Amino acid sequence: MAKIGILTCSNATQDLGCSSVSCLADFRKRKETFSEYPEDEKLTSAGIINCPGCPTLTSPDKLIERIRALTNFGVDTIHFTYCVKSLCPFKEKYKDSLEESFPNIRIVIGTHEEHIAPEEFRRRVKKLFRQPRKTMVDIILNKDEEA
């Protein structure tokens, strides 16, 4: 039985509302990177965790601690989501650090089928981040209901 953990991009999940629905759909259907597991091997989701956020270029310690939480539940493989694969400039450093810290855990970069080319995906995500957004300050200043 494969016990799989999924590492998501906190910008994608917390700021942009990604629910990991495509990752989980391909997990259930054994598509894309999940098709690499033998058909007769049961796949179990050990959990989904968010990356601690950008940047941790000098020290991936926060990420290592989050992964350690999954190791307590017997995870044997961590999949980086498509969002991490396409958006994260630190993914290779994270992968190397995790492989060093957890030599018995396999790290896979990718989850679901790429419905959009990475370059187009990055362009569209960048556009989402640039949209004006209301905050608590807008409520305090009574500007939250302006068009």
Describe the residue ranges of each PLM region.
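Mid-chain, well-packed structural core segment of small domains
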Residues: 60-92, 96
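A generic membrane alpha-helix/interface feature
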Residues: 92, 99, 122-124
